[in-house]
Amino acid sequence: PMRLDVVLHGSSKPVGMSELKFIARFDEGDDAEKSAPDVDFIELHPLGRVENCYRWAGETDVFEAIEAVCRNYKIDRDRIVLRGMSMGASGTWHLGLKHPSRFVALGPYCGYVDTHRFSETPISNFIRVGPLPEHQERGLHMLDSIDYAANAAVVPAIAAIGDKDVFFQSHVHMGEVFAKEGIPFVNLISPGTGHVIDPKTHAEQMRRIGEHVAKGLDHAPRALRFVTWTLKYNRCHWLELLALDRHYERAELVANVSSNGTIVVEKAENIREFAIHPPMLQSPAAKFCIDHAFIPLPEPKGDTTRTLVFSKQGGVWKFAGSRASVALTGKRPGVQGPIDDAFATPFLCVRGTGTPWNHSVGAWADASLRRFAYEFARYMRGELP
């Protein structure tokens, strides 16, 4: 199986990246001689619909593209790297820190990491984002990568940037947050370089990424610390968060696994329900402890694929059952909001049939669907059947 590097592109001024413009970057013409690849891995360059740092539809595109490559090529899923430059680096911070168990290493090259401080970059067409209403400030916790910096303890990040880059402050900011989280920050600085990739610095970045690739992913870490602010980003290796006390507030779980498989949860902040996936808690000797109390577990009975759910009920943690048997209610993964998620996965449009009771309403509904079909095709590149 081969290593896969997912490379996210930067923004394109001034009108956005069209499909033809994007494909033209890789067109070598019709000459008989083609440039031979000088690497022993596959590179995937997703377009990512809408230039918003690979959020929403762009995020869906990245993961669907990865799955398509894995179907068509023999890819080692334990050696998938995520890297990018500029907006692509921002997407690398965003996707990598929020999906820390999906990638073996991250390689952001000069990318922004937050909303407020980035908006203060001294560029003429930038609009400074001042204080926002409380609900909007809370919503930023879903977007800003700095709020997920603690997850760099799960997926290593090797950042790089030029010391003359106008966005240099973004990496300074991320370094400050790493320090607060107690995580060393690797930031390779290219002297005298602006907002471009320096070949020498990039080579060192790739060398260090290669060291992590050689080790591969560890799907059963003995120590796990995972931070999120929304159930949209709820999975890290054998841990799956299922319910939070308060959305858009920091949720953190810290757990350690002993030699006999016993899990001790040291911290479960702003979390109401979570699941432990295999290979954890499969041994008869394994126990589960949270809030200094051991919770009785069912006998494995030879089942090595069971996923166990734990819920806080009346302020007390209890075993709730298997993942397949527990019915989730309220905000839950995939139905946690905001409404943008409805257009990031398959959805259903219902066409009117027969004769409408009210012809005016029927005409309005038909016109609305035609408008939606036009706009969805224009911006999201999707045709209604």
Placement of each model-derived feature along the sequence:
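Alpha/beta-hydrolase-fold serine-hydrolase catalytic core, especially in secreted/extracellular enzymes
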Residues: P1, V172-E176, K180-L384
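Active-site machinery of serine-nucleophile hydrolases
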Residues: M2-Y73, F347-L348
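The conserved beta1-alpha1 loop
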Residues: L8-G10, C110, I161-G162, E266
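Mobile cap/lid helix-loop segments that gate and shape the active-site cleft of serine hydrolases
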Residues: G10, G16-E28, S101-A149, V154-V155
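Gly/Ser-rich "nucleophile elbow"/oxyanion-hole loop immediately N-terminal to the catalytic nucleophile
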Residues: Y54-M87, L97-F103, N151
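Short beta-strand immediately N-terminal to the catalytic nucleophile in serine-hydrolase-like folds
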Residues: L82-G84, Y109, A160
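Hydrolases whose catalytic domains are alpha/beta-hydrolase-1, hotdog thioesterase
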Residues: G91-L95
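The feature captures the conserved acid-bearing segment of alpha/beta-hydrolase catalytic domains
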Residues: T121-I197, A203-G210
